[in-house]
Amino acid sequence: MVSHKKNDRPRPLWILKIHKRLSLFEFKRYATGIGKDDGQDISWVLKGNAKNNVYQVTVETMENCETDECKKVIWVPDELAESTGTMFEDFKEDQPQESVSSISNNEANWGSSVNELDENYEKMQKEETFDPYDSDSDTSEDSDFDEDFEDSDKTMCSGQS
């Protein structure tokens, strides 16, 4: 039997616009203030390998393609923003790096020490169940299909019908 699971996360096709750049340290302060209800997905940063900076970008998603509903704001690590080529270079020239001081007090976790920020960030990484880099997180079929396929493959290989 094939069972299906519904993935409610949008699947980005490409970056349309780069809005903001934060250092990874400053993002750790900001990330604690981003709620799941505001539509800004941070799983790409939490599960990615951000080295220096992270970027707030608008992406076009596979869902409702070519409509306003397909545009989502997400945060991505530097390597994904850099992959936009000319758009990234233009952004880098035109936009200074944001700092936490340019973000409202409500969005930043101001009272945290560096160790506390790192601990909170690691906790957020562990609590994030969706991994956008894992192909299994993006499929519409779960392991029941894989087991059925493996069973039928074994039957075919053994010559049984």
Curated annotation (Swiss-Prot):
UniProt-recorded Gene Ontology molecular function terms: protein phosphatase 1 binding
The organism of origin for this protein: Caenorhabditis elegans
Keywords: Chromosome, Nucleus
Source organism superkingdom: Eukaryota
Motif (PP1 binding motif): 72-75
Name the UniProt record assigns to this protein: Long arms of the bivalent protein 1
Record note on disruption phenotype: RNAi-mediated knockdown results in embryonic lethality in 57% of animals, and of the surviving progeny, there is a 6% increase in the number of males (Him phenotype). Defective sister chromatid cohesion during meiosis and mitosis. Mis-localized air-2 in oocytes at the diakinesis phase of prophase I in meiosis. Impaired meiotic DNA double-strand break repair as evidenced by increased rad-51 positive nuclei throughout late pachytene to early diplotene in gonads, and impaired number of crossover recombination events between chromatids.
GO BP of this protein: establishment of meiotic sister chromatid cohesion; maintenance of meiotic sister chromatid cohesion; negative regulation of protein localization to nucleus; positive regulation of protein localization to nucleus
Polar residues bias: start-end ranges: 97-115
Biased composition (Acidic residues): 130-151
UniProt biased composition (Basic and acidic residues): 120-129
Any one cellular-component term (Gene Ontology): condensed chromosome
Stretch list, region Disordered: 85-161
Job description of the protein: Involved in sister chromatid cohesion during mitosis and meiosis. In association with the gsp-2 phosphatase, it both restricts the localization and antagonizes the function of the air-2 kinase during meiosis I and mitosis to promote chromatid cohesion and spindle attachment. This in turn, drives germ cell immortality. Furthermore, may play a role in ensuring the timely assembly of the synaptonemal complex during prophase I of meiosis.
Localization annotation: Chromosome; Nucleus
Quaternary structure, from the entry: Interacts with gsp-1 and gsp-2; the interaction is direct.
Gene, per the UniProt record: lab-1
